[in-house]
Amino acid sequence: MKAHKTVFNQHPLSLNKLFFVLLLIFFLPPASPAASVNGLYKDSQQLLSFKAALPPTPTLLQNWLSSTDPCSFTGVSCKNSRVSSIDLSNTFLSVDFSLVTSYLLPLSNLESLVLKNANLSGSLTSAAKSQCGVTLDSIDLAENTISGPISDISSFGVCSNLKSLNLSKNFLDPPGKEMLKGATFSLQVLDLSYNNISGFNLFPWVSSMGFVELEFFSIKGNKLAGSIPELDFKNLSYLDLSANNFSTVFPSFKDCSNLQHLDLSSNKFYGDIGSSLSSCGKLSFLNLTNNQFVGLVPKLPSESLQYLYLRGNDFQGVYPNQLADLCKTVVELDLSYNNFSGMVPESLGECSSLELVDISNNNFSGKLPVDTLLKLSNIKTMVLSFNKFVGGLPDSFSNLPKLETLDMSSNNLTGIIPSGICKDPMNNLKVLYLQNNLFKGPIPDSLSNCSQLVSLDLSFNYLTGSIPSSLGSLSKLKDLILWLNQLSGEIPQELMYLQALENLILDFNDLTGPIPASLSNCTKLNWISLSNNQLSGEIPASLGRLSNLAILKLGNNSISGNIPAELGNCQSLIWLDLNTNFLNGSIPPPLFKQSGNIAVALLTGKRYVYIKNDGSKECHGAGNLLEFGGIRQEQLDRISTRHPCNFTRVYRGITQPTFNHNGSMIFLDLSYNKLEGSIPKELGAMYYLSILNLGHNDLSGMIPQQLGGLKNVAILDLSYNRFNGTIPNSLTSLTLLGEIDLSNNNLSGMIPESAPFDTFPDYRFANNSLCGYPLPLPCSSGPKSDANQHQKSHRRQASLAGSVAMGLLFSLFCIFGLIIVAIETKKRRRKKEAALEAYMDGHSHSATANSAWKFTSAREALSINLAAFEKPLRKLTFADLLEATNGFHNDSLVGSGGFGDVYKAQLKDGSVVAIKKLIHVSGQGDREFTAEMETIGKIKHRNLVPLLGYCKVGEERLLVYEYMKYGSLEDVLHDRKKTGIKLNWPARRKIAIGAARGLAFLHHNCIPHIIHRDMKSSNVLLDENLEARVSDFGMARLMSAMDTHLSVSTLAGTPGYVPPEYYQSFRCSTKGDVYSYGVVLLELLTGKQPTDSADFGDNNLVGWVKLHAKGKITDVFDRELLKEDASIEIELLQHLKVACACLDDRHWKRPTMIQVMAMFKEIQAGSGMDSTSTIGADDVNFSGVEGGIEMGINGSIKEGNELSKHL
């Protein structure tokens, strides 16, 4: 009775408990023992106690109630009347893992515990202090924020029967020294993928833990490096080491007789494959993608191999005969992105089980091996793109009934597209890519038989005839891409039936007739591109119903009528190009009402090029945005308008989400039409607009003040209209403006004297009634001045002879005067340069201890006119450079970048130089190129790589630079094996200061100020004294002013450095350079590359540091630095704070580079550094910077929250 009182009488819910027990007895089968009732009751109490410990959330585990059978609880399963399984995946528990160990692990009959993506935090150590049910054999804690060393896994030693443990996608670190003694494991499954595990000691730890029974082991997506000892897991069937930093020979196995799955992709493995795998008879999956294997493909175990991926290595030679042995078993074969050559052998046709073959991006040649390919009766995906195959495409491909994807793009295929390619009514073809070939003739009507077709790309061929109306029957078609052919006739009305259509791209054809209004029935359309045709009629107002439409390109046609106001209803529109048509009427204000209603990222992942026009009379519009999947960039010469229109720059990339919140259009080109009336003031609300071209119309009235609201505009063209009045002062607030053209209007008054107007050339304001800089006509100072000018004019008219005499005397006076002025100018220049050197270093506001840095609006530093530099460039002949590089031989090649290849060369005078061979920039005329060279050559600073000379022959443009002995910071920092240099902290600090000094010079001491646009560690070179020299700073100038727009596309090859605002506005700024510099500084502090899937997974270096800012921030520092000298930790934190300030997501909050230099000076003032790595008297002088910077040295650079604010 006493026991009963304990259970019932002393509890306020005793009646509920009694009812619960009776309920269980009633429903239990007769054979169930009474103990099961008590056991299930205990399980229920344990679960309810766990719920009670959770944060109070009304929607969390709502049916976990004392009056409910626990076997019906959300996520709970029972066996033999006991809780046996708990699955709370994707439940936002938001608790420490210790609660799990206290309440859930002890459940005595629990077999499986799944808490994937449950927002768990804390460490694993609490498990060691808890009980664990003897039946528990599987724990899944993936996708949480559990931290601590992986050696904490030893805490699960209390779970004696644990067989499977999934800790993937957490924040676990390398194994620590402390491990639970006496812990024994019989784990069969261990998943540690996507954590923060780095270093070289993982495998010794695995051996020490006695994981000898492992069958599944994954450490994918970590930061492991070093060599791998001989692997001794006799039961291992699944091993995934992909996406790490291994740079070593292919691992060897003591016993791989049970190995079935091996993934080593995305590392730097090299060496012999065949001998290591020779005894792996059960191997069915082998992925060696993106490694450094070279030479011939070795013989591989052929008994069971089904999936073989060798993509992205340097395998060479003809198609490997060794693969013929695999034909009985292989299902998927990927040999893409290697250097295979020759013809595809007939033996491939014997691979009867093959479902996927990808041999793209190699050098295979010869006639398309049709007979061989037709033997692949089970093939579903066939990718042969980017090779050199010739010949035609036969009807017989229809004999492959399972074929879903056929990609033959970018070859040299000829003939016609066969009419019988889908003659089998049961065909499954979904993707047909034949772009960038030499096909001629019509598009066959019979393509309508490809009823499953989703994507059709026949662009970049020589197809003729009309677009078949029968294509309208392809109900699943999403992509219809036919641009750059010779298609004629009208756009078929039947396309209205393509209800799934997302992309209709028909540019550069000879299409005529109207734009079908019925296209509005294709409600999923994202991209309509019909430019450079002969279309006529009006723009259908019904297109305004396309709420998903993001890009509408109708330029270079014969379209007439008004711009439909209904286009303002296209709430996702970001790109509107209507240039060079016959549009009339006014610009409708409702066109801009969509501002603030942008949909999210409809075009993410589309490959494109943007080609900037050169602005010549023959070249209309701002440029062309083109879909570019499956096309070789060197084939752009085939674009018909390229010949009369020399493009200044080609940008390529993959479309990114344009906005992460509400925004507006980024491109609007209405130029070369017959538009009338005034500019609607509503246009000023288009905050994210980057390019606005209204030139060559008949617009009139005053330029509205509201255009000052276009805060992100980089290109503004209002030329050749009838605008009157003055240039509105509001335009001076457009700080990102890189190009403006107000010429050929009726504007009057003074050109604004402030930036950015003081950087534009005079012809951008010509043929108006404007005055002031940069025009030669000064503005009159008042009535008196006007009267004087009138009198002078009268006197000149009265005495021609006197005027001539005065002119001669004046000319003589000018000659003598210029000699005197030249002498005085040279003296002043020397004084100015000396003053500049002093100015560029001495100013810094002193700060009190413990104060925080504050950035205020600062005046620009005094600037140097580029003409102040005297030393002329050395002109070299092409023969000189050809001889110096041994004909630009690969042996002389020392690097490659976004602007061209770099060669080491020794000139005849013995001097060693670096020669950059530019990519073709055929849009750059000789005069413009020479002018840019002369300008860039005058930019001299000890932290910039100086341009010594140049050479131009035909289309070739060669630049000669001072040679930097130690190459790039990227190589020295991240590839020590290549350079043999180890950078200690004083050396890294010196590099950080030098790079900042060079960038500050470009931003603040040149007119016009120079934006680097591609600041990164590979553009920081190191001379013989390991002094940092910023390189490639002039390339953006050389490639034209258009680089202030869409430069993010050029930077797509170096992700990790691009500031977030570039993805929104596609333009560059000095604050963007500051962000990129902040990434370089992080590289110096952490020793890590800006992007590395092995280090960061889907994140990058900035995001990784941000995550650590929430915890122990010192973990981000390069451990080698602290091993050498632990006392530098405070100094590293101070420099990290500088980096975080540079990396502020809000570009206006970032410091200028002058302010960055001031921070470094303050750090040095408080740390007593040696003079070899400090800012001295000959560096940047900051005392004239208004507002100043304050920084606390002694005290308190707080970890965590304060740093995260800057990120």
Swiss-Prot record:
Signal peptide feature range: 1-34
Annotated EC: 2.7.11.1
InterPro entries listed in its UniProt record: BRI1_island_dom (IPR045381), Kinase-like_dom_sf (IPR011009), Leu-rich_rpt (IPR001611), Leu-rich_rpt_typical-subtyp (IPR003591), LRR_dom_sf (IPR032675), LRR_N_plant-typ (IPR013210), Prot_kinase_dom (IPR000719), Protein_kinase_ATP_BS (IPR017441)
Enzymatic reactions: L-seryl-[protein] + ATP = O-phospho-L-seryl-[protein] + ADP + H(+); L-threonyl-[protein] + ATP = O-phospho-L-threonyl-[protein] + ADP + H(+)
Gene3D superfamilies, alphabetized: 3.30.1490.310, Phosphorylase Kinase, domain 1 (3.30.200.20), Ribonuclease Inhibitor (3.80.10.10), Transferase(Phosphotransferase) domain 1 (1.10.510.10)
Post-translational modifications: Glycosylated.
Binding site for ATP: V894, G895, S896, G897, G898, F899, G900, D901, V902, K916
PROSITE patterns: LRR, PROTEIN_KINASE_ATP, PROTEIN_KINASE_DOM, PROTEIN_KINASE_ST
Membrane topology: Single-pass type I membrane protein
Sequence intervals crossing the membrane: 803-823
LRR repeat locations: 109-131, 135-157, 161-181, 186-207, 213-234, 235-257, 258-280, 282-304, 305-325, 329-350, 353-375, 378-401, 402-423, 428-450, 452-474, 476-499, 500-523, 524-547, 548-570, 572-594, 664-686, 688-711, 712-735, 736-758
Motif interval(s): Cys pair 1: 71-78
Any GO BP annotation: defense response to fungus
GO molecular function: ATP binding; protein serine kinase activity; protein serine/threonine kinase activity; steroid binding
Top-level EC class as recorded in UniProt: transferase
Keywords of this entry: ATP-binding, Cell membrane, Glycoprotein, Kinase, Leucine-rich repeat, Lipid-binding, Membrane, Nucleotide-binding, Plant defense, Receptor, Repeat, Serine/threonine-protein kinase, Signal, Steroid-binding, Transferase, Transmembrane, Transmembrane helix
Active site residues of this protein: D1014
Domain Protein kinase: 888-1163
Free-text function comment from the UniProt entry: Receptor with a serine/threonine-protein kinase activity. Involved in the perception of systemin, a peptide hormone responsible for the systemic activation of defense genes in leaves of wounded plants. May also regulate, in response to brassinosteroid binding, a signaling cascade involved in plant development.
More about this protein: SR160 is almost identical to BRI1, a brassinosteroid receptor identified in Lycopersicon esculentum. Competition experiments indicate that brassinosteroid and systemin are probably perceived by different regions of the receptor.
Domain-level remarks: A 68 amino acid island between the 20th and the 21st LRR is essential for the binding of brassinosteroids.
PANTHER family on file: LEUCINE-RICH REPEAT RECEPTOR-LIKE PROTEIN KINASE FAMILY PROTEIN-RELATED, OS11G0197000 PROTEIN
Family membership noted in the UniProt record: Belongs to the protein kinase superfamily. Ser/Thr protein kinase family.
Protein name from the UniProt record: Systemin receptor SR160
Source organism of the structure: Solanum peruvianum (Peruvian tomato)
